[in-house]
Amino acid sequence: MRYPVILAMACLLIIQACKKNDEVNIDLKYDQNLSLEYHEVIDAYSQLANHYAEARLVEMGKTDIGKPLHLFMISGDRDFNPESVRDKGKCIILINNGIHPGEPEGIDASIQFAWDLLRNKNDLKKYLDNVMIGIIPVYNIGGALDRSQYYRTNQNGPIYNGRRRNARNLDLNRDFAKQETKNARSFAKTFLFLNPDVFLDTHTTNGSDHQYTITLIATLHSKLDPGMGTFFKNLMLPELYERMEKNSEYGMIPYVQMSNYLGNIKDGIIAYNDDPFYSTGYTSLFNCYSFMTENLVYKYFPDRVRSVVDFLTQLTAFTYDNCSEIRQLKDEADNKIKEQNTFTLDWELDMSYSENLLFKGYEYIRPEPSEGRRMRGYYDHDKPWADTIPYYTLYNPVLTVTKPWAYVIPQAWSDVVDKLKYNGIEVYRLKRDTGIEVETYYIENTERSERPNQGHYVNRNVKVSIVNQEMPYYKGDYVVITNQHANKYIVEMLEPHAPNSYFAWNYFDPILESHDFYSFRSFESQLMELLEKDEDLRAAMEERKIEDESFASDQMAQLRFLYENSPMYEIEKYNRLYPVARLISQPVNFELEEDTDTVFDSE
């Protein structure tokens, strides 16, 4: 009787497993114009993870509100180790939702998509043969917990929305470069863990009105490795638009950022320059194909959700069909960037080049002013149109830099080094005190933003001068060698004149302050004595007086001139000296040890 009993038990387990799967009933409410609350979202993913062996829900770190950042993974062969998945030649997609919880369609759409995938609706499960899916259910948890019917008041559903900013009143889609929030650091940990080939962030836009429910921001192809960029522009993007047109009732158009900012779409739209503080700008630094869906705020919420479900399906289908080439191009880019010498820090739109784009819009009506009041224009839905418009897609480099062999960072700035470590950057430390000949930057000029941005008065239009000099370094100071697949991130964060560098975000601002200086009354006689003894200095002083009349009559300017040309000025050597130095080539007898300190244990 032993074997029949075992067989019966096995059959019972199979039946129970099948029944268990059949019992999954996710209560999505988007057809009722409602988005799930945070606890309902996590409960939905917990149900899916409990019922399907191909799914797993894990915590990846803390967020500013104290709640964990979750990652939901779907793997067809139940292998949830991304390294192992990649070793099998599979592709990985990461989907981020709820960065702005007032734009929630991606939250509900991702649950619907995951459920459809796991229960093999429309034969979707085949995509899991070579694609692993990672989903961040809600990124801005603090904003999601603060719900109101008055957030996003001009939005056509859902009835209740979350708050745009997080628990620290920061916009998380401006924090990916500087990573001040626990959310951003937990995202970096998640991104490093998965090392995705494709990334998607879901949003809603409240810009112009037109006939499309869903629009798409794609990272600039020119920012990618040339091989990846060519594939992205010539195959991936056109095919995604084509697939949405063919397989979705909604269709899709590039994100509408108007070229004239006056409301006339017919004058053309421009490709979005996604700087590294945005999610897609950040992820593309690591050779990842990056997208941001932007649903139109005026379209009904259920339609917005369904359009995102459709895009998730088509993005996964494309990745499934082209996984081999996607993987090959990314792997090649990861290797090539280690040897790449020149990096672009800033870009400028080229308005002399445009492509033709078929666009479906509405006539824009601008009423005449009434009784001295300016009447706001509107889009007349009774007057639809379809026409070809210019689409400006070309950005040219306007600021480039040649990477050094390594960057040297004094240990006094360890908080900046921690930011590098959060992003998987390999760091070394000096084994002994030493003097090193390095290339240094002096900050000659910088402009401050007039208003706070993310709690910062950002440094803009930074001008630097270069001085080669020997600097003292000490045991424990940091060295970051630029032979890494994350070189693009390293360079853009550590070059002070890069628009999104750590310097731009004020992490080195103390160097802009001067503290050592002379007292006018007690120091004048000492300087005059120096002038009498130094014939060359006296001659330079007289020449300056002849050349500059204002200088000749300004005693304070003359004292400053003497001070700056005296040995005493050596104390000012560190004034406005950017502390991160460039080591152009590897020195002889350069003793380093790997820094094994981790940063995630403290989170």
Where are these regions (language model features)?
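Hydrophobic h-region of N-terminal signal peptides that target proteins for export
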Residues: 10-17
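Structured catalytic-domain cores with a bias toward divalent-metal coordination
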Residues: 3, 18-603
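Alpha-helical transmembrane segments
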Residues: 4-8
